[in-house]
Amino acid sequence: MSIKYIGLQNWREDLSSCSKHITLLFLVFQGCWSISEMLKFRSIYAVRELRRFMNWDQENNQIFNKLLLVGFFSLLWWSSMSSLSYAQITPQGRDQTYKQAAPGRFEERFKQKKLPQSQVVPVKPDNLRPVFPAEMRKVKFLLQRMIIKGSTIYDKRKFSRLFRKYLHKRVNLEQVYMIAQEITNMYRADGYILSKAVVPPQKIEEGVVQIDVIEGFVNRVTIQGRVRGPRKLLNEYRKALLRSRPLKARDLERYLLLVDDLPGVSVKSVLTPSKFKQGATNITLIFDTKGYEGSVGADNRGTKFNGPVQINAGVSANSFFKNYERIGLQGVVTSNTDELKFFRGFYEQPISSEGTKLFFSGSFSESEPGSALKSFEVAGESKTFTLRLTHPFVRSRSENLNGFVGYTNRDSETKILGELDSEDRLRIVNLGMSYDFVDAYRGINLVSFNLSKGFDIFDSTKTGTAKLTRLAGHSDFTKVTGEMLRLQQLAPSWMLLGELSWQYSFDKLLASEEFGVGGAKFGRAYDSSEITGDQGLAFKLELQKAFQPKKKYLRDLQAYAFFDYGKVWNRIETTAGSKTQDLDSLGIGIRFNITDMISGYMEWNKPLNRKVASEGNKDGRAFFSLTAKF
């Protein structure tokens, strides 16, 4: 019998185990031979008696004895091999099961990547200076006093800095208009985009000049297009814009983006000056709504145990109950559906006009890994429920600050050879934030932080309970995780992406809470969660070059090359006898948009410092993904 080595036991242990079984078989053989001789004697006697009636000969008697002996040895061989298979379930094999095939880690594996909301907005530099008629320079007078009317934002001292140097001096009319322009610039610099200063028609007497400030505001908001949800929420956004007097750019941007963030809603705004009120502006919101969204795709990012081909599909309904809610389903299966099944449903609901959202999700996953783990009859399942409250403290095109608080309830169990091997029931409270922004160098940045705390509540498995995924793991753990990302334009069509992810734990963790390296995000030449630990650090650098072929069936193309590295630290030694593990890889690839709906990537990756556990080598590997959205 040939047993494939998968890191479960070294060859000396295999040899020792096999030699013990061979010795046992030899002793059993001797005993069975003695029994067979006795059986032979009795069978001969029985046959002689039967020959009196049936005329059997000696040859038939020998065949009967041989069949009896072969059947007996077959039973012993089957029993021996069953015992031998069970002996192969070593700590190393158990570790590999919980790294790459345990359903408790699928939630993290299939989680959608968080992307920055900020974007670089093209802005043309304002190099144009106002041009005034030359005749203005000829109109000169002694400036004794300047009156600024109409401002509700700034006090007199703020304005006096702008014209103090001109007082009690001879000035021309052009200089007066320049002062008005400086007041306008001051308002615009502070975000009052509709406000301005003007010099009204007047007769200058005794050196007194008046400048009027027109503080712009929103007078009316109208909506065009189909509205799928209640107008009550839209009215709240409308009132917020009307309250912003004078109108600030950050208020206009925030509430327009919050409307655009509603599920299935895409909005454009048109600003027009009012014909009846000075300083008033009317806003028209043009709605484009989508009732549902979906996608279907395939990739080979699975493992030999679960995959490698994965088929994923998702669909979400927007405002199905006419309340601006979003309801969605996601599913992932492998080509052999018994090896992996993952299903997730979610519900998201806005609960305030300031962008606060309530989010529910529930997922179920099932795993019966194949390949070298198939003979161990590994079977696991996981159920996760999540409740989260999110709020955008800052929402704009160039800067966003989001906070959240959440609760996760996760139950998972794994059986090996039909026996319960582990059972984790975790109750976790999360608190976190994410901040993304565009800096002065036109780089897009993302920083996120998450604090997770486990509690022994609601029938959780307590620390020290038997049959945990990691016997020393804590269910009442505390850990912090974080991510950093920067996307920098180097030149037209050239970009450099840098990304860092980390985790620090104050306790020994259970398997589903460990930091994993390997898979589509970090350690791309390796399988998902190739190495795991209580603490971890991973980073990648990716150079990107964009092309625009503008072909009918090839809209966009991006070539890239990357290097990534990851390391994990454990608070206790692993079964390999080490507290640290690391890996690195490099690769090249292309991303493409075939049409507006179909996209994908192809890449070739090379493991560098360690072998891929499931492959047993460091050969290059090819990966692909193809997705259709509708």
Model-derived segments and spans:
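Residues that define the transmembrane beta-barrel architecture of outer-membrane proteins
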Residues: 279, 307-311, 339-343, 381-385, ...
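Outer-membrane beta-barrel "beta-signal"
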Residues: 315, 592, 618-630
